[in-house]
């Protein structure tokens, strides 16, 4: 980013070889973790996670995805970018050059069969 004093740069390092954290290892209080697990077992709904950069949003979301992942489910994500790949989950990178936006990806997902 250009500033009056010169360029400002931030570098984000992702360690692709690291294992995705288990929900138990994220430091939630036991009761909070149990509530999260209960919500994740529901057949539908929305869980919204927000926070500043570096607060653990992606780590929490990837842990949740791993928790619900099984062969009976068709889990699809739309990400910008896909930070970590999870076997068994269909992860889609947003690609504006190919006109693959979040909106178009979501519309395509909604047209798919369940499995």
Predicted regions and their residues:
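Switch/coupling sub-region of P-loop NTPases
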Residues: 35-47, 53, 58-115
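N-terminal "pre-motor" subdomain/linker immediately upstream of P-loop NTPase catalytic cores
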Residues: 1-55, 60
């Amino acid at each position: 980013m250009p500033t009056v004093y010169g360029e400002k740069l931030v570098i984000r390092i992702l360690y692709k070889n690291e294992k995705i954290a288990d929900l138990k290892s994220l430091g939630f209080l036991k009761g909070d973790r149990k509530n999260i697990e209960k919500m994740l077992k529901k057949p539908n709904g929305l869980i919204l996670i927000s926070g500043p950069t570096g607060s653990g949003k992606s780590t929490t979301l990837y842990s949740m995805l791993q928790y619900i992942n099984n062969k009976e489910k068709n889990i699809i994500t739309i990400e910008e970018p896909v930070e970590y790949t999870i076997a068994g989950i269909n992860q889609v990178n947003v690609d504006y050059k190919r006109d693959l936006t979040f909106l178009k990806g979501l519309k395509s997902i909604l047209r798919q069969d369940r499995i």
